[in-house]
Amino acid sequence: MTTLHFSGFPRVGAFRELKFAQEKYWRKEISEQELLAVAKDLREKNWKHQVAANADFVAVGDFTFYDHILDLQVATGAIPARFGFDSQNLSLEQFFQLARGNKDQFAIEMTKWFDTNYHYLVPEFHADTEFKANAKHYVQQLQEAQALGLKAKPTVVGPLTFLWVGKEKGAVEFDRLSLLPKLLPVYVEILTALVEAGAEWIQIDEPALAVDLPKEWVEAYKDVYATLSKVSAKILLSTYFGSVAEHAALLKALPVDGLHIDLVRAPEQLDAFADYDKVLSAGVIDGRNIWRANLNKVLETVEPLQAKLGDRLWISSSCSLLHTPFDLSVEEKLKANKPDLYSWLAFTLQKTQELRVLKAALNEGRDSVAEELAASQAAADSRANSSEIHRADVAKRLADLPANADQRKSPFADRIKAQQAWLNLPLLPTTNIGSFPQTTEIRQARSAFKKGELSAADYEAAMKKEIALVVEEQEKLDLDVLVHGEAERNDMVEYFGELLSGFAFTQYGWVQSYGSRCVKPPIIFGDVSRPEAMTVAWSTYAQSLTKRPMKGMLTGPVTILQWSFVRNDIPRSTVCKQIALALNDEVLDLEKAGIKVIQIDEPAIREGLPLKRADWDAYLNWAGESFRLSSAGCEDSTQIHTHMCYSEFNDILPAIAAMDADVITIETSRSDMELLTAFGEFQYPNDIGPGVYDIHSPRVPTEAEVEHLLRKAIEVVPVERLWVNPDCGLKTRGWKETLEQLQVMMNVTRKLRAELAK
């Protein structure tokens, strides 16, 4: 009989219950016990959904109050020593301080989890890091599930992936792989504690196997799993996000009891494991996208597998369902307005049912689920033949693009002269990245407007009032290039998606980005175009309030692509170029309206990189072309900015330079300007604004901290090409700390300008 299991589930709840409870706890509106009760209820509900799908195991250990890699830092005693906390007796309050910072310490650095839109907290490893086991997080969840009479499979990120996703810190140079001999016994203790608590199977996640690992890291898998296999539980080694076929010989030889492979991202890798002689878990339902599977096609893959493997075949989603929204059935508006599109979708709960149908078809025959299979086929056929998806005018515009359509009129050296002639900026010009605090009043006005409780005129007046406040406060602070604050925008991608054709939206399609932050990605289901101007009215209103230059603010094509659920029937590169041309219409309209500084945000450029380096060039070529297409045709005097965050650029700097933005602002404060060194060594040719303080924390930096970062920047970037700005947009901050943080930034800038003028 085929076994059905789950790798992981969304944590936040169908209606973001965890987010709201966390934020109430942080505001001291509920007690720790009340927060714990919400979490316990969510875990139980998740397990019940897995049971309802006829799962043989429920997943435990996947739930977290913030991030599963932070949980692992606590479980291994690898929390940063700079906090002075005891990992063996860490309070929930201290756990949150690790993630969010406190008055004495900045938060742990955050970056993207492989090529997803989820952020994890980056482990800080020092040459003298000591590890200490604390399995409480995993054991408690296992016992909770057992108390409900459930058969549970704990899931833990493996030791090599844990080291791989961390960073070396401290003055002493070392290779973090050298910490493995100290880390491994701690893993043995954690797994042993789970065995003693009754775990039969333990899933160990090693997504690092899907990237280009150095040879010594690959070799280390032999010793690691030889050691871990001595623990008396069965180990399911789980890989995902890409192919591990190149490691097939190694993986077949490892003394583990089962292997999970991602057959959605890399279906071709199945051939490499055709002769695998243990449990093979086939990840056949997409854990990262929202399209309904054609179950008949999936069965064409798994039925021959079952014939060969028998009871050794397990089925699951490709990866944790963390990356998908919770439940399609609550999307009543989408069902009413776009019934065809609704029928093509599957969220987490629908995916669990797809797996239930597959299990039944395999174990009891296709006839036992004939109705469900027919419905799946009908949805696939409807989507393949829909006229809602393909538009001849969009296809023609792309096909008719002339050669060099993506190039600016002149090189940067000429453009910057034309720009400075009218901008007349001082040394170390200051700006903001874009958004200002989204207050309760803003959110209430937007909600009331969407519900029809507030008229369009009243909504516009409310937003204009907020824009006027943002402009006034920036002028008081004496910033050089202003932003309008984006009060009218719910989300930097959703806002544009709502105004572009080919996009659709959900009401409750939230996925976790980090901690309590959730995003509701748009669905790109069809060809993309721009019916009318999207930002011109707001930007020109803001410009009318000030003599200082006002930045137009757009989200770039690659980021819109990366942060959406993208159609999977045409290449992503084609979708991206469609978005770029729609944005180009907006850029040229802004320019016509007198907005001559325009920022095209591309925070997601790096996360779009394929996991295998061999595939990078193709991606970077079409991503760069898409960015340039979005700003093509501008006058030399129009200054194009871009912003990138959560990123490491060292290995893609030529591609970043080839985007040819006049000014790039980047997130650097949490990494102590580490990123900037690469820009200096590469001699990045255009202007650059490294973030001088971390906006992800409410903490107000000291002037000494900001000065330290700015001086580091001056050492690396020629001062005439250096801008000063926060790390990122200020949407999630409160007004009080925002103004205090910006005041510190301005005080330091003035001090250094005076010094440089001498």
From Swiss-Prot:
Binding site for 5-methyltetrahydropteroyltri-L-glutamate: R16, E17, L18, K19, K112, R517, C518, W563, E607
Pathway linked to the protein: Amino-acid biosynthesis; L-methionine biosynthesis via de novo pathway; L-methionine from L-homocysteine (MetE route): step 1/1
Binding-site list for L-homocysteine: I433, G434, S435, E486, D601
Disulfide-bonded cysteines: none
Binding site for Zn(2+): H643, C645, E667, C728
SUPFAM superfamilies for this protein: UROD/MetE-like (SSF51726)
Keywords of the record: Amino-acid biosynthesis, Metal-binding, Methionine biosynthesis, Methyltransferase, Repeat, Transferase, Zinc
Catalysed conversion reaction: 5-methyltetrahydropteroyltri-L-glutamate + L-homocysteine = tetrahydropteroyltri-L-glutamate + L-methionine
Active site residues according to the UniProt entry: H696 (proton donor)
Superkingdom, natural source: Bacteria
Function: Catalyzes the transfer of a methyl group from 5-methyltetrahydrofolate to homocysteine resulting in methionine formation.
Protein name: 5-methyltetrahydropteroyltriglutamate--homocysteine methyltransferase
Organism the protein comes from: Neisseria meningitidis serogroup B (strain ATCC BAA-335 / MC58)
Source taxonomy: Bacteria, Pseudomonadati, Pseudomonadota, Betaproteobacteria, Neisseriales
